[in-house]
Amino acid sequence: MEETGRNGEEMERTLVWGHRGASGYAPENTMAAFEKAVELGADGIELDVQLTKDGELVVIHDETIDRVSDGSGWVKDYAYAKLIKHNFNRTHPEYEHAQIPTLEEVYALIKPTDLTINVEIKTGVVFYPEIEERVLDLTERMGLMERVIFFLL
């Protein structure tokens, strides 16, 4: 996509990315934030992936749920069924209830759009065996390999 710059020459358009979704408008890394990024016309979204005790790929930046939810503790110590009982609206309390999404749920939302997805795989603080393979397998299974940028931290 090209636009005209100040000097009248054509230039590439700056791309707009939703960091943790549209986290300025909705609780970060929640479906509401990703839906808002789509609604606002973002070119792409950035999200973070951690792994639950029962092996679910969940979208959350921190290794603990303390900062963004009404709960506390390490993501790795929660089964997904227990994790979704917490309210992840701490950064935007005006949202009555925001659940932590799975990576598959976010992929399903983004798949019908033309957005690019930057997936940050979290392995710096907590070592998750095989998380990279699990993310790659899901991405391939959902037909999104051409639209995903992977970043390991």
List each model region and its residues.
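Phosphate-group recognition and catalysis centered on beta-loop-alpha active-site segments
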Residues: 1-153
